[in-house]
Amino acid sequence: MNKAEAVAGYQTEQMLYMNKPYELSAFSYNAWVDPPADMLFPLFVQSLQASGYFFAVASSPTAESTDYRLDSQLLELHQNFLHNPSVIELKVKVVLTQVTANQVIASAVIKEHVPCPNNTPYGGVVAANKSTELMTKAVTRFVIHHIPPAG
């Protein structure tokens, strides 16, 4: 699995929100400990490994002898105040490649929208944690669905 990337605007530790259509803003006093794409990467690796479907899940782009590679790109992660209650909108693009043939097997854009328990940055964090849990499960299901069992 390659390290997750993020589209422009989401390559930051800033916690982003939307209160006007098509306009992202950042909370002044709140931030993620790392860019969200960097935080998603180990969670995807852990989820794939915990599935028990794979003998090993390599977390290095230079890993030798891998059959498949999963690339991911964070497309959106923000708290949307255009809804009440506000919602966390998380969107990730995943691309699964068969390495030896250098052929894309499948790709998808996976979206999670989770209501925030309250309209504060902390409420966004709670919802972001839930959306991340749902996203890691969805990515794992996507990969397992597209890779035949070893045998």
Where do the PLM segments sit?
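Surface-exposed short loop/turn segments
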Residues: 51-101, 117
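Buried hydrophobic packing residues in well-ordered domains
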Residues: 1, 44, 72, 92-94, ...
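Surface-exposed helix-capping loop/turn segments at secondary-structure junctions
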Residues: 50-57, 141-151
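Generic short beta-strand segments
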Residues: 4, 73-77, 111-113
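Short secondary-structure boundary motifs at beta->alpha junctions and helix caps
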Residues: 24-31, 100-141
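Extracytoplasmic/secreted envelope proteins and their assembly/folding machinery
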Residues: 37, 41-45, 51, 129-132, ...
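A structural "domain/chain start" motif
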Residues: 1-37, 145-151
